Amino acid sequence: MGCVSMTLGIDEAGRGCLAGSLFVAGVACNEKTALEFLKMGLKDSKKLSLKKRFFLEYKIKTHGEVGFFVVKKSANEIDSLGLGACLKLAVQEILENGCSLVDEIKIDGNTAFGLNKRYPHIQTIIKGDETIAQIAMASVLAKAFKDREMLELHALFKEYGWDKNCGYGTKQHIEAIIKLGATPFHRHSFTLKNRILNPKLLEVEQRLI
């Protein structure tokens, strides 16, 4: 990759889901390569179609001048360790693998999870997936992994609408949990916290509002 300045962008997908894994991705490349991806239509993954995300994922993974890392934390790990700890561990793993390759590290959001003491050149950027190409590339990669996981799980549990909601707490998804209960792929710490698994309590609360 030569001596050209390299930037590592980090972003996640699945943070606020009720089901499935958290995926954290890191993508490292120089500005010339980043520009190539912007010309391909790269932007914040939430603004791309599923087909376009999978297309860009393929391009990221097969480009000779791009380094990439994806870390998965399962629903069980999130329940055991907590979401914050899982995010930190995933970011840390990416930094340990990618830090030596790059000159700059840019993380989407407003926290470096305390890792800026060990990696002082980390920058946190709110809505970084809208302004930094490498973060947008990481966003696409993480979201594509999350999309694929939930499509595969949807084949096993069609009633929860995971092909459409991707594990997020939509009305249909919550109603399915109330009616059918949670699957082994649900984050029980999330569903219990939101009182979803106790519909009687939920009805009482609605009457109190």
Swiss-Prot record:
Binding site residues for a divalent metal cation: D11, E12, D108
Catalyses which reaction(s): Endonucleolytic cleavage to 5'-phosphomonoester
GO molecular function: manganese ion binding; RNA binding; RNA-DNA hybrid ribonuclease activity
Keyword check for DNA repair: no
Keywords: Cytoplasm, Endonuclease, Hydrolase, Manganese, Metal-binding, Nuclease
Keyword Isomerase listed: no
Every RNase H type-2 domain range: 5-202
Enzyme class of the recorded protein, top EC level: hydrolase
Top-level taxon of the source organism: Bacteria
Family designation: Belongs to the RNase HII family.
The protein's name: Ribonuclease HII
Gene source species: Helicobacter pylori (strain ATCC 700392 / 26695) (Campylobacter pylori)
